[in-house]
Amino acid sequence: MNPQLKVTIRRDTKIITYPFTNYFKEFDKVEAVQHLFGEKTEEVLNGIKVTFYGRVGYMGVSSANGNIRISAHYMKNGDLRDIYLDIIHELVHVKQFMEGKELRDRNFMYVERPTEIEAYRYAVKEAKRLGMDDKEILEYLKTERMSEENLMSLAKIVNINVDKISEKN
């Protein structure tokens, strides 16, 4: 107990993590994931941890340990297909982390960062495999944190035909 405050504050908090496979089942059978990790797919997925946090947001990979951090709000309320594609995107970052790549290279803007381009290309390829058209993929790529200019830049980088979408509107 702190004598001045007359309270005890326990400061040894623990961030609770869960095995990836507790929440994300059958990803070892997804061709895109198998392509990422090859023969080690099951082993890698079994080794990934996920941490859910309380803030509104999406998900990302910790550059400290390679674990996936997910907004509990997004997990509960997000579009299931978006969550699936985001997991594919984040698994690319897990692989990049395992390869020792710098995930948050500040020399690049977010949409021009090589690690992000690779992850977005992978997610877009999977979106196309699911049958999503360019307009749906553009909507998937859009977030409130990304300017319209950055969205269009990213869309072009990952080969989304934004001109074709504009013509339809």
Question: Where does each model-flagged region fall?
Answer:
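Surface-exposed helix-capping loop/turn segments at secondary-structure junctions
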Residues: 39-45, 101, 130-137
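Short active-site segment of divalent metal-dependent hydrolases/proteases
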Residues: 88-96
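Non-transmembrane alpha-helical segments in soluble domains
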Residues: 34, 88, 120, 124-127
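Post-HEXXH active-site segment of zinc metalloproteases
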Residues: 81-85, 97-121
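A metal-dependent hydrolase signature that marks the N-terminal structural subdomain at the beginning
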Residues: 1-58, 145-169
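Short catalytic/ligand-binding loop motif for oxyanion handling, primarily in non-cytosolic enzymes
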Residues: 59-60, 95-96, 102-105, 145
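Active-site scaffold of zinc-dependent metalloenzymes
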Residues: 49-81
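Short helix/loop segments within enzyme catalytic domains
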Residues: 124-147
